[in-house]
């Protein structure tokens, strides 16, 4: 065999003129076809890949034959087919191609025999909770690889119904898919208490971000420090009991240590966002050209956006976005105040019924006032001794309490070991 290959290669080497004229002259008896094809292809300037089923021997006897004709005759006489893939010829045995086509015909016949048109059943199925389009898409991907004449699934978006024309044997699978995904989406109610409290009051409560949390006998541990801009120091923690939040806020307001800004309850579906916005638009004048002016507005608001995801253990993962934009009149330019922005974006896991508290967004309020003793303060000369002007600068912290609850869940909120003692808390601090 090796001698035959060497002899064939030498026969090609002895016809250098063939490269210029693109004609082939070669004569050889019984050489392995897997050797002959690449040699002829190389002489003709072609790249080939041989299929694994190609085998046998071939005799070559070409006398000044065009190269392309010689190559085609070599393939045809040995029942081989070629197909171009890019710049490469893929050579395949004709029997292999015929077998593949025969298998495809057999599969088509099998489908026709399996799903005769008379076996097609037609039904209208109403989808209650899920999207009919999603049901059809999922079923087609999973179960309808055996397509057949007469089979179809269409959707009526108006009634959220599926019109199915399928073999009877397919409907149990379709019903199982519908039963699995056509379920009501659970709802989550998130009670939010947005509080603006003095920093002194927060310190009296023992609120310390970035470590342990304690409000009297309230107790929690923060989930970790957050990376925020310098000067923000935003943090969060969990409270073990929420039964006396109302009393806590009432005492705060009665002592003048803060106020409840907003108390919204956001109701949303699992994996759906909900938001609340409270703010104002600040008017200012701007040039409109040709010396004219127009009134424009800057938006300053407190916004809260949440997206709950219910976990299998009935805890709730919440994506939280808190944003507070407030005007900074002390740095106003031509009467137009810049907008100071504080923003917190985080994801936290909260057990059903427990409270997470977010804080660390600060603002400063400057207050000026005066007091005097009636009558005496009006006496010239000595009256000024009975007057007093006051300038108070106080820093406030924005605290946001979030309590998520899964609607319809009968499980009691998880309790921690330390329980809030209202009498001790109010007696010591207020």
UniProtKB/Swiss-Prot annotation:
It is found in: Host membrane. Pfam families: Secretin, Secretin_N. Gene3D superfamilies: 3.30.1370.120, 3.30.1370.130. InterPro entries: GspD/PilQ, NolW-like, NolW-like_sf, T2SS/T3SS_dom, Type_IV_pilus_biogenesis. GO terms for biological process: protein secretion. Its main location: host cell. It is a single-pass type I membrane protein. One of its GO terms (cellular component) is host cell membrane. Residues 1-20 form the signal peptide. The chain crosses the membrane at residues 226-245. The keyword Transmembrane helix applies. Keywords: Host membrane, Membrane, Signal, Transmembrane, Transmembrane helix. May play a role in phage assembly. This is Putative assembly protein ORF430.
